[in-house]
Amino acid sequence: ERILEAGLAVLKEDGYAGLTTSKVAARSGQNKALIAYHFGSKQGLVAAVAREVSAAITEELLEGIGEPRTVAGVARGVVDGVARIMERDEGLARLYFDLASHSIVEPEVRAIIAEMKQGYRDAVGLVLARVKDGPKRSSDADGAAVYLIACLEGLALEQLERGESPALQRAREMFVRSAPAAVTGVGS
């Protein structure tokens, strides 16, 4: 537990490139051999931290979404949930995008990000399957989950780059209004 907390703190402060087992050992009060024993490598530690963070974020988002009845309700829940999480701890979003950027060139990190995103898609897909105007086919539900998550990533990146702004608030509202048409294909 202390090692995972230290790993998360170092990742948020120094990023993936700056993470070393020496830094995690110093921060956790554990030795490098213990870290190697439990996690095998830097990538093993990063994967364990990412799983913990991903599970916590997913749980918080699902609690925040509640039991929406419409796609718009799902969109409202996830966009507000991500904004709340970022307001509380912007470092989590920085960590996510840092890992995503490294996933392009590092297969181990790509596997970590793929696992995280699959978990998000599965969770959003389950919520979409329960709403009255949600996708009827599983392939459409998969596409809808990818769409919603991609939009959330863009909004989160905008918040990281420029901070909270009236334009970002309007963009979130546009997302909530447009999500039902995009997900159900209405108007296409």
Model-inferred region functions:
Residues 29, 40-44, 48, 66-70, ...:
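Residues in soluble alpha-helical coiled-coils and helical-bundle/repeat scaffolds
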Residues 51-56:
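Short, basic, alpha-helical segments at the C-terminal edge of helix-turn-helix-like DNA-binding modules
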Residues 84, 121-129, 151, 158-188:
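C-terminal peripheral helix-coil segments that are non-catalytic and often amphipathic
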